[in-house]
Amino acid sequence: MVNMKASMFLTSAGLVPLFVVCYASESEEKEFPKEMLSSIFAVDNDFKQEERDCAGYMRECKEKLCCSGYVCSSRWKWCVLPAPWRR
């Protein structure tokens, strides 16, 4: 009976490190796609949106003037496309 208890103890003691190693490698595999996507979609300084002196489409035009091709809506105070009915 003693041998049976010892063999069960050794088996369980051997399985615990195996489970720990498997869990650690699985968690690394789960982190790998996240790291890859974050490196692919990382914002580079060259591609950051530049601050303009004018407001673009559907932007507030209270303080800034609208860019060429847009007019400031008197009702909403947004830069919109000029149209005949907006006078």
Swiss-Prot record:
InterPro entries: Huwentoxin-1 (IPR011696), Huwentoxin_CS1 (IPR013140)
SUPFAM superfamilies the UniProt entry points to: omega toxin-like
Compartments, as annotated in UniProt: Secreted
Record-given protein name: U3-theraphotoxin-Hhn1a 13
Record note on domains: The presence of a 'disulfide through disulfide knot' structurally defines this protein as a knottin.
Disulfide cysteine pairs (residue numbers): 54-67, 61-72, 66-79
Signal peptide range: 1-24
Gene Ontology terms, MF aspect: ion channel inhibitor activity; toxin activity
Tissue specificity of this protein: Expressed by the venom gland.
Role according to the record: Ion channel inhibitor.
Keyword terms: Disulfide bond, Ion channel impairing toxin, Knottin, Secreted, Signal, Toxin
Stated family: Belongs to the neurotoxin 10 (Hwtx-1) family. 51 (Hntx-8) subfamily. Hntx-8 sub-subfamily.
